[in-house]
A protein has these predicted regions:
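The canonical Cys-X-X-Cys-His
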Residues: 53-64, 100-113
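Electrostatic cytochrome c docking/interface patches
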Residues: 30-51, 81-96
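Stable alpha-helical elements in mature extracytoplasmic
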Residues: 41-48, 53-56, 101-104, 142, ...
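C-terminal capping alpha-helices of c-type cytochrome domains
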Residues: 156-216
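Phospho-regulatory, low-complexity terminal regions
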Residues: 20, 141-151, 158, 214
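Post-cleavage N-terminal segment of exported redox proteins
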Residues: 2-43, 55-58, 63-73, 199-217
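Gly/Gly-Pro-rich "capping" loops immediately C-terminal to redox-active cysteine motifs
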Residues: 69-106, 115-150
Length: 217
């Protein structure tokens, strides 16, 4: 009888959790406008670029050297002539981008839905800490480069602009790096604007045809 009661309790709790999950309000809304001009799309992308190139995003969107960066005011001082430095402790995430070959990122960066961490303590979020795929290299890249990368399915995970918007909302819903970018805690500077504004800009840029600035801009 006790086993039956326990089984029923687990079933009820599981069903309630599933129902709550299915009806919970998304952490950000995706509401594409009916129309958007090229000028509006370019303005939206400029704000997207400000987010993508910000230290909270770009520091882990690095190239095939697989070394995360430390940039932004909380990581000063920097080497002469630079506004950034390599991650301390000789960290290299290797080809796996999670450090499995040497020292996993999760050794210091916990996986926990609690985004709060002390200043200069390893930050953490709700999914395993890792570098973004190398195709998503943003650190030190121009607005034109990042724009063309984001609109290229071969370099953005096979997504169209709506897929990119859903990626932002889904990642944030799992309390991943997207949400952490605006809630980094400690003395870390958050990404500009807000998650909702970023999603709004993504869909405006998409409806406008994903226009990109020229390299000179």
């Amino acid at each position: 009888m006790k086993k039956l009661i326990l089984s029923i309790s687990v079933l009820v709790v599981g069903t309630m959790a599933y129902a709550a999950d299915k009806t919970a309000k998304p952490i950000a809304d995706i509401n594409p406008p009916t129309v958007a001009t090229e000028a509006e799309g370019l303005a939206a992308f400029q704000r997207i670029y400000e987010v993508a190139s910000h230290p909270r995003c770009a520091n882990c969107h690095v190239g095939d050297d697989n070394i995360p960066r430390w940039s932004g005011p909380s990581y000063a001082p920097f080497p002469p002539g630079q506004d950034w430095k390599y991650h301390g402790m000789n960290i290299n995430a290797d080809v796996s981008r999670i450090g499995v070959e040497t020292l996993p990122c999760s050794t210091c960066h916990q996986t926990t839905p609690d985004l709060k961490s002390e200043s200069h303590a390893p930050p953490h979020f709700g999914i395993d800490w890792q570098l973004a795929p190398v195709e998503f290299e943003w650190f030190g890249k121009s607005a034109s480069f990042i724009c063309n990368q984001l609109k290229d399915p071969d370099r953005n995970g096979g997504r169209d602009w709506m897929g990119l918007a859903h990626h932002l909302v889904d990642d944030a819903g799992h309390r991943g790096p997207v949400l952490w970018g605006w809630k980094p805690s400690g003395n870390r500077e958050p990404a500009p604007y807000s998650l909702q504004q970023h999603v709004d800009d993504m869909v405006v840029w998409g409806v406008a045809g994903q226009p990109c600035p020229s390299e000179e801009e």
